[in-house]
Amino acid sequence: MKRGMREAIIGNPVILQGMLYLVLKLMSLKFVLNATFRRLIKNEYGTFDRTIALQTRDKSIKLYVVFHDGRMTVRRGVPAHADVTIVYRSPQVIREFATLSPEEMLNYLLTNKLTFRGNLSHLSRFAYILNNFAPGKKGRPVKDGAAPAAGGHAPAVRTGLISRRGELRSTPGDRVKYLREPYLQAYTIGDFPGLRAQRELHFTARPCVCAERARLITQYFLDTGFEYDRSGNRRQPVLRQAQALKYLLTNKRPIIRENSMIAGTTTSRDVGVIIYPEGHGITLWPELRTVSGRKLQPYDIEEEDREILDKQVFPFWSDRNVREYARLSNNFPRYQELDERFVLYFMWKTVALSHTVADFPRLLAHGVMPIIEDAARRKEEAQDEQKRGFYSAIETALRGVLIYAEHLEQEAQRLAVQAGNADRYRRLADMLHRVPAHGARNLDEAVQSLWIFWVALHNESTNAGLSLGHLDRWLQPYFESDMERLSPGKEQEAYVFHALELIGNFFFRCQDHLPLVADVGNKLFGGSSSDQAITLGGVDRSGKSAVCDMTYIFLKVTEMLTVRDPNMNARYHPGVNSDEYLRRLVEVNMVTSATPSIHNDAAMIQSLKSVGFREEDAREWCATGCVEPTIPGRHFGHTNSMMFNMVAALEMALNDGVHPLMDEQIGPKTGSIMEGAFAAFEDFYRAFERQLRFLAYQTIDYNNSLGLAHQDIRPTPILSSLFEGPLDRAKDLTEGGALYNTSGVACIGLTDIVDSLMTIKKLVYDEKRTDFATLRKAVDANFEGYEKLHTMIRNRVAKFGSDEREVNLLAQRVIDTVFDIFYTRTNYRGGHYLVGFWSMSNHVAFGTLSGALPSGRLRYKPFTPGLTPENVRGVDLLSSIRTIAGLRPERMPNNIAFNVKVAPDSRDTHEETVNQITAYAKSYFELGGMQMQFNIVTTETLRDAMEHPENYRNLLVRVSGYNAYFVELDRDLQLEIISRQQMRV
């Protein structure tokens, strides 16, 4: 049969449906004939009794599958109430599926070739079932910690690590008391064998899925009940959660890693991927057989863990995770369906609400016992049953933390007897006998106390964006008290060495876990770790410099280790913090190539004051996750509640409410360009604003419904115990217990919006060089056949970052518009929505799902990251600095990410380069710029890293707010970073 005829036959929907029906029927026989396959849908834990429908958008193909009591039945048509309906854009898409693995099917969700209605958990299980029928798709053999690091590359041991060091020296300034040379240039990573060993493990151990947490909490609820206890009484969510956490922490394996100065681990693996089935854990279901073999960020998984997740854990949580609870509670809302198209916005509450910072100084000063005693007293005094339940929850959860510490103490005592280095384990046991139950007396106890509580928090809340705050100033009193007891000279110098080693150990403890990212998420959040932000410097509550000895200890550790997490952020207050401090921040950026991010303290404080934060509280702000501000212990802001694609609103305004990729009427009809709408630019701007408002309100409604789901599914009693407000109000943080209760928005695509609007305004309305219909046609054609118009757009229209007054005013107008839209709405806890302009890696993901734009950006190309000008003619570093610094911080209270890619001149010395970059940074901050982050690396180096990744294992880059290892990024994201304008200094 000729190929054309064969294609025509297979392409016939009737024939294609018949073929698909036959394939599914053959599958159904497998469940009858093979007990192993039958266990996929019926086993000792229960049965998969669901209906899955499959149809094309034009309904030319309609089939459905019924799973019931261990059998699979295939039928024609689509039932009225399927649990999941999979909709294919066309019959051609169904044909393509023959060559895809089931987890690759989910990647089709990104491009909207595949959409679905119904329960995503059931779709994930169906994909896993299909995966078991796919030949040759199994992952690699599993052995925890034995293989190379994530990213798909396999460097030999001790190769590929870039080693650099600072050269500059300084004298004490700000509030430095003991460091005679604050830059600490006498020390290198070579002086710390233990840190070198841990760094080697970090870059060679493959992440491994850890089912410990998921298994324990699931077993607890199977034994005791979830919605109702075994007596039939409805369980109070916060108390239920506390009891589960106590069970988890009581039964969690106590581990003290070799070479570590700190006891306790987040997971039972060297580098563990934690599963939160009540959050987004079920997204791993389709990949349980293949995740260890995927190209980007592969995870090992043991067969026992795979079995327990598939058979017990994921089925239990299929309807009890936050996403599905919100769906069922709101009758399958449209705003949730739009989120699951991945093009318009991404809602982080489906994963976490952990972007916040606790009151760690309270923990360090007093320990857990006073909080337990306070909760017990309040419980006795409370008259209301719900309040008594809340206080009991605080007490119960914190006792779980102490039980975990007690088990670590016992493990240290055991190792002191059985292992070598008995003195080390005895010291750990002595510390664990005191902390975190009581206040810390020295730096070692403070770090140990902090770490145990940090482990507990990550077993309560998703390891995404939960941040550590001002560790330099919070640990400084313990450093000072230790130093005061030592003689100047060798004793104090030895202690500085010890402090560096201890903080280095803490950094690697923070690296012992990774967030779960499904393969489809690698395009959305490429290379991101847990983003545990630490904030240094700035001013204290009274407005005085907070730069201290520990600030420089942390900076030196950052320089020596050059790791992506913790995500280091530094506050710089012009006129208060010293030039020597700013110069050191720049030098560490130059050595590491990408960290820390630097923030203008004055601008951020003013921005927070303008939206209702008290000045004293605003002065204590610290970065959360990426760059977002949080007031530690007072402000529960979920600062990354959503990633909002503003460009989608522009595309919808250009298409009368239709989104081109989705090919559906999404927003309101606001006027057809092809029919002569929009007589003036203001008419089109109003259409854009209306589409923007429509999308924003969808996200707000969804965020609020997800927040209510968190109240019922996963309250946070441990986190609430270290906040001001919850105990006084007898309210969990998820219910509005904190003093400040905002929600943070990340607005993506501002540069692309401004440049597009300027093109429309200038060429269509002001200069009339083209008409709107022609411009729309050019955009639809990706400018093919409209090359002259494209050249005119790129060369004649002033761009964002050029410091042209008209462009700057338009940029501020767009910022004001989106600020007003969000700020005037309240969240489920009664707080405001605060906007910021940063993008993680979603500027690439959203860009690859979007068409060409009037700015001249071509189809499927990334948007510009954060609040960064595009790499075009007429935009240089100075004009960019003036443009960004001229925007009003008061309208961007969730902060910005201004990415600057710097290529040092090879003719300049190290000191000259540092001084030049420092001068630019200082000018930017003095002009009022909010934030600046660097990639100090040449384009040539990045291209070589793409070709020879084995030589660049620790090449650090700033994406947009967070750090990543360049060689672990998706190719599209690598190319986006390479394409950024390279500024010469």
Sequence positions of predicted segments:
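Feature captures hydrophobic
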Residues: 1-158
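Short linear functional motifs in flexible/disordered or boundary regions
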Residues: 77, 124, 138, 417, ...
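Charged, alpha-helical scaffolding/interaction elements associated with membrane systems
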Residues: 99, 111, 418-420, 484-485, ...
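Amphipathic alpha-helical repeat elements characteristic of tetratricopeptide repeat
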Residues: 106, 406, 472-473
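Conserved catalytic cores of very large enzyme subunits
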Residues: 160-394, 423-985
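Extended non-globular scaffold/tether segments
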Residues: 392-403
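Extended, non-transmembrane alpha-helical coiled-coils
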Residues: 403, 407-410, 414
